[in-house]
Structure formats: structure tokens, C-alpha cells
A protein has these predicted regions:
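N-terminal secretory signal peptides and thylakoid transit peptides that target proteins
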Residues: 1-13
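Carbohydrate-interacting regions of secretory-pathway proteins
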Residues: 18-199
Length: 199
């Protein structure tokens, strides 16, 4: 009897990601599929999107060309402080969007990164769990938007769970970089950014 050998090949991350509905938001090398607003400077370095202020401390936004209403986004972020940045979602304009904030608590009375900001309303929900923020390294963030239900998890902790119907979407996902001399030298690094549509 002839012996048959079977070889099992592990599923690659790219295939597994596609099968579970997750899609990368950038290719790790270029900013293809993104558009810029404002004068901030954006580049891809070592597989991460890096944002810096433009001349004179100018602000700016980097936004996906595609839009979603209901979705989950995962990413990792790291900040060179002092800084004020965030992850836009359901973005239509700077006056019509939600943002998962990435900010220095000393500028906002102890409000921490991972708080939910709504343009026109300030903070809809505040994160005050210091254990959820790694100030000196990478932070894993997960944003879920399903109708009015908005959730933010950071480093394995659920830091925001609320309901708000101000911006139902669809809109872009993006990265915000704040203006101001007080944030001179700021760098926001974002990597491993992917999305799963819930529509």
C-alpha cells in the first residue's frame, strides 16, 4: 500500500484577515487611498504612518478616500509628546465628525487618550483610566461604531461605551494633527490599521 503524506500549510495573516472581513487601510509603504487636508506633513516610515505639524505649527488631517457608516477599526498608535492628535471616524468635515482622542491629559484636566470627542459637543465620553494608556510606547486601539452605539477599547480595556446620534455616517476614517506652538516637535505614529465593515 502506497503511503500518502499530507502537508498542512498555515493560513497567512493576509488570508485570515480577508476571511474574517478585515481589510488593511494602507499598504505599509505608501499613502495610496488617502487624501490630505491642511498643511501637516505625512509620510510612511518603517511601516507606520507618521504625522508632523506643517510650517509654523500648522494642523492637518489624513483621511481615507472610502467612507463607512458602521464598522470596527483596529490600529496601534504611539505619540512623541507633547501632542494632540486623534483618530477621526464618520468624518465628513472638521465640523462633522467623531474622534477617538490622543492627547496630553495636562491640557484637558486629566482627560486621557481614548476619550470620545464629537465636533460641536466637545467630549461625549471621557477616559480617565490611566492604566489604559502606555505613554512611552505603542497602544492598541479598537473603535466600533454601530448605529448610535460607539465603543472604544484601548490596550484591552473598554474605555468608552456610549450612545450618540449626532453623526450617523457614512464618513471617512482618518488621523488628525492639532495646530499650535505648544505641540512643537509632536509626532503621531499609526500602524497595523485595518477595518471591518458592519453594514
Amino acid at each position: 500500500m502506497k503511503r500518502r503524506e499530507f502537508f498542512f500549510v498555515p493560513i497567512t495573516g493576509a488570508v485570515a484577515s480577508a476571511e474574517s472581513g478585515w481589510l488593511p487601510l494602507y499598504d505599509g509603504r505608501t499613502l495610496q487611498g488617502w487624501r490630505q487636508e491642511g498643511k501637516a506633513l505625512w509620510a510612511v516610515k518603517d511601516g507606520a504612518i507618521v504625522g508632523r505639524q506643517g510650517p509654523g505649527g500648522a494642523a492637518g488631517d489624513l483621511l481615507t478616500e472610502k467612507q463607512w457608516a458602521n464598522f470596527e477599526v483596529e490600529l496601534e498608535w504611539r505619540m512623541k509628546w507633547p501632542g494632540n492628535s486623534g483618530i477621526w471616524f464618520r468624518y465628513v468635515s472638521a465640523q462633522s465628525s467623531y474622534q477617538a482622542d490622543i492627547l496630553d491629559p495636562s491640557d484637558h484636566s486629566g482627560v486621557l487618550s481614548g476619550s470620545l470627542y464629537c465636533t460641536g459637543k466637545a467630549f461625549v465620553a471621557e477616559n480617565r483610566d490611566a492604566a489604559s494608556v502606555n505613554r512611552d510606547g505603542w497602544n492598541k486601539m479598537r473603535i466600533r461604531a454601530m448605529g448610535e452605539e460607539l465603543t472604544i477599547e484601548q490596550n484591552g480595556k473598554r474605555v468608552v461605551q456610549t450612545r450618540d446620534k449626532t453623526f450617523p455616517g457614512p464618513g471617512s476614517v482618518g488621523i488628525q494633527l492639532h495646530a499650535g506652538k505648544s505641540f512643537e516637535g509632536m509626532e503621531i505614529h499609526v500602524r497595523k490599521m485595518r477595518i471591518r465593515s458592519l453594514d
